[in-house]
């Protein structure tokens, strides 16, 4: 055995070497990576280390690269087992992933440092954010399908090894997690924590297209080992454990055997510990099994002899180190270590790493030491080939837990079709992510292209940018002639973006960079923004933002900060106490006034009922408004009061050429705002009365102009509070509770609509007009048909009136953050407690579409499944009804997120959920809440008629049902979707021409119509069956539907056609 410690093998500093916390060896054995307190990840040549004393290697490169992508101390570095990636974790809470580029590095050493120029080109490809505290250790699965990071935030975070998406966060430990190791059979991984436990988690390697929603039943806790760590110290920096190469044992650091420090050997399966490696005087912080199995006979003599007896026993080798600065190496058949090296370093040893051949052991220490222990041949035994490792792991099998058995060939065929569709979908998303232009106009079932002939001879998964296709030799273009002849609508925009100069604060000119990879003219298949204003149809009116439509009215007047305030008065009101005067009893004052025939007016005050009194009038400056609106008498007895807007001198609102609301600013219209085409202006009189009486005021003037040219004007007897309008009509609300409506030409469409109180909100969308009064009544009118879809409705249920009306004192209730109306005349409300509501005119009741409970309990909050497809609306593909109620549900959920974060409710709700998850009986709470959230989304989209969102949420719901294996809900969902697909023509005609008609049946599950929420039921059912087809435990339900829809027959016909050709 030789110990090699080169002088140059350090993380050098100005005064001393930095502490080295971690090391690892690449799978090919040519590179050693180390991480230290200087924030650098350094990659060294192992050949240079082994031959440090050889003069011939003096001029050869020693340090291959140095990476500085962390802002603090780096605690862990690990190569992936396929040799493709390198990961590092540090106290900046970040995990960085690097990849080795074959081309030489383009940069030299950094100016002002002593760093040698890099020899290899390592590039950072991902920065993974998921921890709330220091990252202490990392581990790759043996097939490199997942990366697991652990840290001081007590979290175990699982990342995809393909896309590096966060698949799951496991909050299982109760204290700092300081070690992670993987089972070489790829069945388990174990984590060690300061809560004095090692937890074993069972997992199944996720596929490349797996998302967090597919890993619900994956990464589950198998067992918790506590016995070896009952009195273990909590002062160690690491608890780095290791799994034996034959998969039968775990070497656990920081164990105790009575008062003595030890390394515990945990047996696989029973997860007990009956063996302890005792000998260290301080806690063991790191254990490392050699990756090879060893034999005391040469590999050629390990075969069975003539009598059939087995050859020599295979053994494993383990190295342990810790705070006593010593290193011990053990062989499993010997009760004592074969070697113990003391005072190997001046401080505790932090990490150990074996070379792939099992002959070299690297060690790092907190004093900056980096060394290698080289074992001579036969000193540990004869290293066996890796095939012996594979043979020893075969006894653990490779079956998937819960995968089930395929019961028929049709079930296997359906599973293959389901997985093939998912693979095509993920290839398209990865192509869009990497900058390849994939047209998303022809999306078939499960994300597969609707017309495969357009891709020519390209194979599945081949990224073919449509903007770079070359014509063939015969002059015929690869695509269709129409596609080739059309000019690129993005070419002019890209030309304007190129070399666009910008100027900094100090006047220096800069050229804004342009992303070249995204310069294709095709649409990305990645999810786009869910919330933008409604854009006009046609190319001329398209904005530079996403084309997703929010089917809600845009408010002309911005609501005050915090929304429209509301107060609820209880039913049991008492008289207030009067402090001034001889008699302070309100009851006596009211009784005395009543004796003379008077009917005293009582006003609701915070302390109770008091007689009405004239308020003192003082001269005050009112620059922004004239006065408060006159209080309507009905306000004195109403239990709901909303804040009334003040009377302003000048009210101006405008719309652009497409009828969209826009701000009116003189010459200051920015590029993101279109200039107002029509401007409605209301002017209220602010001077003294011309007759000398207060009640005699000049009328308010309402006028419409286009630019500087007046179109029409009208006069109203009362002050105007609110105005709104679009290309179909204009409306104004006055302080006496009247609403006036004009045609675009200025003709009064109807007589004044008289309401019971002052309007506090006036919104319009297409032909619909929404008005909310100060007493909480909501009115909706169709200006075209002069009808209302429902009677006036109260906001009392939305404002929790059922809870607060029985109190004696007025109660502050949630404020109205947003009140909008959709193109279907549906009222949409968002309140300050985070709830989102919609009024259902068919049920005559409010429906809660979004609530804070789902925000903290559901795993699908503020997320969509990108494998299903985005919500980008293509009018030529989905039809004109695609914009109906689009974006309403994401809009309400976004408001819920904002409100609970701003008001601090999220913290307390998260604490409640965390406590519930640890209680008995709530093991499936998170899964149940997530399914309930998806069901609420599907029901909300169906109720609103949101076509695109209904399909998206329906497929997300189907995928979750398949992951959970819920057979009853799956069967019920398929029965609800089948509808009248296979009913007779006469029976179908009778069901459609019934009392309610086809439109009403589109919002029902159990009906005989061919469509649901604007989608053909057959298409949706086919997509759902394909999404569920990969789950074998549900194939008894899905295979009959696949036969009924002809899915399996289509695949067989395609296969037969391929054979014939």
From Swiss-Prot:
Residues 456-468 have a biased composition (Low complexity). Required for replication-independent chromatin assembly and for the periodic repression of histone gene transcription during the cell cycle. WD repeats lie at residues 15-54, 69-108, 130-169, 172-211, 233-276, 279-340, 344-385. GO terms for biological process: chromatin remodeling; DNA-templated transcription; regulation of DNA-templated transcription. This is Protein HIR1. Keywords: Chromatin regulator, Nucleus, Repeat, Repressor, Transcription, Transcription regulation, WD repeat. InterPro entries: CAF1B_HIR1_beta-prop, HIR1-like, HIRA-like_C, HIRA_B_motif, N2O_reductase_N, WD40/YVTN_repeat-like_dom_sf, WD40_repeat_dom_sf, WD40_rpt. It is found in: Nucleus. CDD domains: WD40. GO terms for cellular component: chromatin; HIR complex; nucleus. PANTHER family: MEMBER OF THE HIR1 FAMILY OF WD-REPEAT PROTEINS, PROTEIN HIRA. Residues 469-481 have a biased composition (Polar residues). The keyword rRNA-binding does not apply. It comes from the Eukaryota. One of its GO terms (molecular function) is nucleosome binding.
């Amino acid at each position: 055995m030789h110990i090699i410690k080169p002088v140059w093998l350090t993380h050098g500093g100005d005064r001393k070497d930095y502490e080295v916390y971690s090391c690892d060896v690449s799978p090919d054995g040519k590179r050693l990576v180390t991480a230290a307190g200087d924030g650098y990840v350094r990659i060294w040549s192992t050949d240079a280390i082994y031959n440090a004393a050889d003069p011939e290697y003096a001029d050869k490169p020693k340090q291959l690269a140095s990476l500085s992508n962390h802002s603090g101390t780096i605690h862990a570095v690990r190569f992936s087992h396929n040799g493709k990636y390198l990961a590092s974790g540090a106290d900046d809470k970040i995990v960085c992933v690097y990849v080795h580029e074959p081309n030489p590095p383009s940069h030299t050493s950094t100016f002002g440092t002593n760093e040698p120029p890099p020899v290899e080109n390592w590039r950072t490809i991902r920065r993974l954010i998921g921890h709330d505290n220091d990252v202490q250790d990392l581990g790759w699965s043996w097939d490199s399908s997942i990366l697991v990071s652990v840290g001081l935030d007590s979290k175990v975070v699982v990342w995809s090894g393909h896309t590096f998406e966060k698949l799951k966060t496991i909050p299982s430990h109760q204290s700092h997690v300081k070690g992670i190791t993987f089972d070489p059979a790829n069945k388990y991984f174990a984590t060690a924590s300061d809560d004095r436990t090692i937890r074993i988690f069972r997992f199944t390697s996720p596929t490349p297209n797996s998302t967090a929603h597919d890993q619900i039943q994956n990464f589950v806790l198998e067992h918790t080992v506590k016995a070896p760590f009952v009195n273990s110290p909590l002062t160690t920096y690491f608890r780095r454990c290791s799994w034996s190469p034959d998969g039968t044992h775990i070497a656990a650091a920081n164990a105790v055997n009575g008062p003595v420090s030890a390394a515990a050997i945990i047996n696989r399966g029973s997860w007990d510990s009956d063996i302890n490696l005792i000998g260290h005087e301080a806690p063991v912080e790191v254990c490392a099994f050699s990756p090879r199995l060893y034999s005391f006979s040469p590999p050629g003599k390990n075969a069975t002899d003539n009598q059939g007896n087995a050859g020599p026993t295979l053994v494993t080798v383990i190295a342990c180190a810790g705070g006593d600065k010593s290193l011990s190496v053990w062989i499993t058949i010997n009760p004592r270590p074969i070697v113990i090296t003391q005072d190997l370093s001046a401080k505790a040893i932090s990490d150990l790493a074996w070379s792939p051949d099992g002959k070299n052991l690297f060690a790092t220490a907190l004093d900056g030491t980096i060394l290698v222990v080289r074992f001579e041949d036969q000193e540990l035994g004869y290293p066996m080939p890796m095939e012996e490792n594979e043979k020893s792991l075969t006894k653990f099998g490779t079956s998937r837990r819960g995968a089930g058995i395929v019961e028929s060939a049709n079930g296997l065929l359906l599973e293959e079709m389901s997985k093939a569709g998912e693979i095509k979908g993920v290839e398209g998303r990865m192509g869009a992510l990497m900058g390849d232009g994939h047209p998303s106009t022809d999306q078939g079932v499960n994300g597969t292209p609707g017309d495969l002939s357009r891709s020519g001879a390209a194979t599945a998964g081949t990224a073919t940018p449509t903007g770079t296709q070359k014509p063939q030799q015969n002059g015929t273009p690869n695509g269709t002639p129409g596609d080739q002849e059309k000019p690129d609508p993005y070419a002019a925009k890209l030309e304007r973006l190129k070399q666009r100069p910008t100027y900094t604060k100090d006047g220096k000119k800069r050229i804004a960079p342009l992303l070249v990879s995204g310069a294709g003219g095709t649409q990305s298949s990645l999810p786009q923004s869910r919330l933008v204003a409604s854009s006009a149809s046609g190319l001329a009116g398209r904005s530079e933002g996403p084309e997703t439509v929010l089917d809600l009215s845009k408010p002309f007047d911005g609501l005050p900060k915090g929304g429209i305030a509301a107060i609820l008065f209880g039913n049991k009101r008492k008289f207030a106490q009067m402090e001034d005067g001889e008699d302070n009893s309100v009851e006596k004052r009211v009784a005395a006034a009543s004796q003379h025939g008077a009917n005293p007016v009582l006003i609701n005050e915070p302390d109770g009922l008091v007689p009405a009194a004239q308020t003192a009038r003082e001269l005050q400056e009112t620059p922004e408004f004239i006065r408060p609106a006159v209080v309507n008498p009905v306000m004195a007895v109403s239990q709901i009061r909303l804040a009334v807007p003040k009377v302003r001198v000048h009210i101006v609102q405008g719309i652009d050429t497409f009828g969209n609301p826009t701000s009116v600013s003189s010459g200051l219209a920015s590029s993101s705002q279109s200039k107002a085409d029509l401007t409605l202006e209301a002017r209220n009189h602010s001077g003294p009365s011309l007759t000398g009486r207060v009640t005699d005021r000049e009328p308010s003037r309402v006028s419409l102009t286009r630019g500087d040219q007046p179109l029409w004007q009208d006069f109203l007897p009362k002050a105007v509070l609110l105005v709104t309008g679009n290309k179909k009509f204009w409306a104004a609300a006055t302080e006496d509770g009247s609403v006036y409506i004009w045609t675009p030409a200025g003709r009064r469409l109807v007589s004044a609509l008289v309401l019971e109180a002052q309007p506090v909100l006036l919104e319009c969308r297409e032909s619909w007009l929404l008005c909310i009064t100060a007493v909480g009544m909501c009115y909706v009118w169709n200006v075209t048909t002069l009808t209302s879809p429902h009677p006036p409705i109260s906001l009392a249920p939305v404002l929790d009136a059922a809870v607060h009306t029985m109190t004696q004192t007025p109660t502050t209730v949630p404020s109205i953050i947003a009140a909008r109306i959709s193109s279907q005349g549906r009222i949409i409300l968002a309140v300050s407690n985070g709830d989102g509501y919609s009024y259902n005119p068919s049920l005559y009741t409010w429906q809660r579409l979004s609530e804070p409970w789902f925000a903290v309990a559901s795993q699908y909050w503020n997320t969509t499944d990108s494998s299903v497809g985005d919500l980008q609306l293509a009018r030529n593909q989905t039809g004109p009804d695609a914009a109906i109620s689009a974006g309403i549900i994401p809009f309400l959920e976004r408001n819920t997120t904002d409100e609970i974060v701003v008001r601090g409710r999220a913290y307390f709700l998260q604490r409640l959920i965390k406590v519930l998850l640890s209680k008995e009986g709530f093991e499936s709470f998170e899964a149940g809440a997530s399914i309930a959230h998806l069901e609420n989304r599907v029901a909300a989209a169906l109720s609103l008629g949101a076509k695109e969102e209904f399909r998206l949420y329906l497929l997300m719901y189907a995928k979750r049902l398949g992951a959970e294996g819920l057979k009853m809900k799956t069967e019920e969902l398929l029965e609800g979707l089948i509808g009248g697909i296979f009913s007779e023509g006469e029976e179908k005609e009778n069901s459609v021409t019934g009392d309610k008609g086809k439109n009403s049946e589109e919002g029902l599950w159990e009906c005989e119509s061919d469509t649901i929420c604007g989608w053909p039921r057959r298409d949706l059912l086919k997509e759902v069956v394909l999404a569920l087809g990969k789950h074998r435990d549900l194939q008894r339900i899905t295979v009959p539907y696949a036969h009924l829809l002809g899915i399996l027959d289509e695949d067989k016909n395609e296969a037969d056609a391929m054979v014939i050709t």
